Amino acid sequence: MSDLHYRLPHFDWLVKAADDVDIVAVVGDLADVVNAVPHTVQTVVLRKYLGLLAEKAVVLAASGNHDLDGPGEHGEQVAGWLRASGGDNVHVDGTSFDVDGTRFTICPWWDGPLTRQTVADQLAAAAVDRPERWVWLYHSPPAGTVLCHDGRREFPDHDLAAWIEEHGPDLVLCGHIHQAPWVTGGSWHARLGDTWVFNAGKERGPVPAHITIDTDAMTADWFGIYDRELLDL
């Protein structure tokens, strides 16, 4: 799932749902820059939620554009609070995590040429000795898919599309474009070559839009507030 945007009832739901899964993946925009709650306060609360989730499941958390909180050592914006949240059961920006033949690579939202190169280097390093399956967390959806269309305009990430072509991951989890699954001609899933790309979308409701992946049955179950779909992988 992605784009919770500091909607605390959705985080509460996620903590309860974590009882039934092995891994929780949140693909960007945990915080919300237009919320009346100061960003510095939001991140304190969000770190507590990450800790609660980590008591129940492995947590993978990638940053989105709303999560940036200041310049890194290179002068480009990073989600410093999220990087500081990493721990034994919480895997964040810039890391990879291997379990049961699957590698999860968690990419940060990049803000300029230096952080873009950091992502390129991260993916190249993670490609070495890759296991049977490789999954990326990357907030923005790639060019060449319906996942980057909001019904009026496209917001394609050409760099991600190029990296997918170069490395051929099995699955990329994205977000960012909230309306993508529900616009005319839209969807929550797409293919680029042999790579599946998912964007669960974001809508109001007591339960957030989310995707549950069963790696034994090789299925993806999308809950889309008004819709539901099961996909064979």
Say what each PLM segment does.
Residues 1-5, 101-110, 135-139, 196-202, ...:
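Active-site-proximal beta-strand elements of phosphoester/diester hydrolases
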Residues 5-10, 31-35, 62-73, 96-98, ...:
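Active-site environment of divalent metal-dependent phosphoester hydrolases
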Residues 6-98:
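Core catalytic region of metal-dependent phosphoesterases/phosphodiesterases
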Residues 18-19, 50-56, 128-130, 164-167, ...:
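Short, conserved loop/helix-junction motifs that constitute active-site signature segments
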Residues 26, 31-52, 147-185:
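Cap/insert and terminal regions of metallo-dependent hydrolase folds
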Residues 32, 67-162:
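Conserved catalytic scaffold of divalent metal-dependent phosphoesterases
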Residues 96-100, 166, 180-233:
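Binuclear metal-dependent phosphoesterase catalytic core
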